Amino acid sequence: MNKPAVIALVITLLDAMGIGLIMPVLPSLLREYLPEADVANHYGILLALYAVMQVCFAPLLGRWSDKLGRRPVLLLSLAGAAFDYTLLALSNVLWMLYLGRIISGITGATGAVAASVVADSTAVSERTAWFGRLGAAFGAGLIAGPAIGGLAGDISPHLPFVIAAILNACTFLMVFFIFKPAVQTEEKPADEKQESAGISFITLLKPLALLLFVFFTAQLIGQIPATVWVLFTESRFAWDSAAVGFSLAGLGAMHALFQAVVAGALAKRLSEKTIIFAGFIADATAFLLMSAITSGWMVYPVLILLAGGGIALPALQGIISAGASAANQGKLQGVLVSLTNLTGVAGPLLFAFIFSQTQQSADGTVWLIGTALYGLLLAICLLIRKPAPVAATC
């Protein structure tokens, strides 16, 4: 058993549960300090504030994990999250919410370091499967977290934050007492041994520029369903909240299944390039169908295609991780987290605006834009060459 990688999965699951726990109740907590008319604005600002802090600080924390080790940075990140949730649980004024979110965003390196641990402890050929499991663990946490948070929030809007703080404290103790990072056995030339840990961001990222563009754009496209799903299904099919929730739960469960099981199984038989193409084509087809379907029942078969598209990102992340030495995985994974959070800020703003402008005349426009962007990514993947020093092609 790959103990470091398994612990990384557990850390990711618990971290995602903590995030998911607070999602249903943060607006309720804001209502304790704000009039109803101001809740939505402050809710959006709090979410964006965390993401912006991640964009700025995730690469730096990833770099520190290369220099100081994965364990100290993981402990810092988990301590920051536990402090954030404790502060929110005890909050009695609005500024405490903002302070907690800022601290959590600055110290939030769990995702980057967990991915670095997976890269440290697995062979290049195994990374697609393990990155798929990592994504599935995060998805499972985001399914379980809101369910628990919703129930706890009925008792008190502060209770989910208490539970999230306890989860992070338990994870902190697990990392402190159990986690031992994998011993890096990667063979390096003598000059690389001296210089690799000090390699600049530009030197590291330049050979991976096109792959990083593909990663960023794929994550940006993923913000389309995350942003407009509720609005679109209510507008076109007149769905109520129960129907929307059922569809999202089904999509989340199937997405986790494809990432945890299907991506790894395919990686044993197919190249990463083939898996990426298959995932992008599945998503592009699903987006095209979403723009055209006219009845609510038609959504459910499309969910399978949307979930199937989830096999692309683990394969893409596996290829990108192969473009960095073991001494630079934290730096690289921090950049990927930063890019992901950047799409989390820009995507909802962009796609919500597009949907609002086209809802009355052509509410499927946003899905067609996603289809076109996938076409661009497929063309770019044909042009990408092998990045130095050890990355494969896309």
Swiss-Prot record:
TM regions (residue ranges): 6-26, 42-62, 73-93, 94-114, 135-155, 159-179, 198-218, 243-263, 274-294, 296-316, 335-355, 364-384
Entry's localization field: Cell inner membrane
GO cellular component: plasma membrane
Keyword Cell inner membrane included in the entry's annotation: yes
Principal location listed in the UniProt entry: membrane
Keywords linked to the UniProt accession: Antibiotic resistance, Antiport, Cell inner membrane, Cell membrane, Hydrogen ion transport, Ion transport, Membrane, Plasmid, Transmembrane, Transmembrane helix, Transport
Keyword 4Fe-4S annotated: no
InterPro entries: MFS, MFS_dom, MFS_trans_sf, Sugar_transporter_CS, Tet-R_TetA/multi-R_MdtG-like
Membrane topology: Multi-pass membrane protein
MF term (GO), any: antiporter activity
GO biological process: proton transmembrane transport; response to antibiotic
PANTHER family on file: MAJOR FACILITATOR SUPERFAMILY (MFS) PROFILE DOMAIN-CONTAINING PROTEIN, MAJOR FACILITATOR SUPERFAMILY DOMAIN-CONTAINING PROTEIN 10
Family statement drawn from the similarity comment of this UniProt entry: Belongs to the major facilitator superfamily. TCR/Tet family.
Function, in words: Resistance to tetracycline by an active tetracycline efflux. This is an energy-dependent process that decreases the accumulation of the antibiotic in whole cells. This protein functions as a metal-tetracycline/H(+) antiporter.
Protein name listed in UniProt: Tetracycline resistance protein, class D
Organism encoding this protein: Salmonella ordonez
Gene name in the database record: tetA
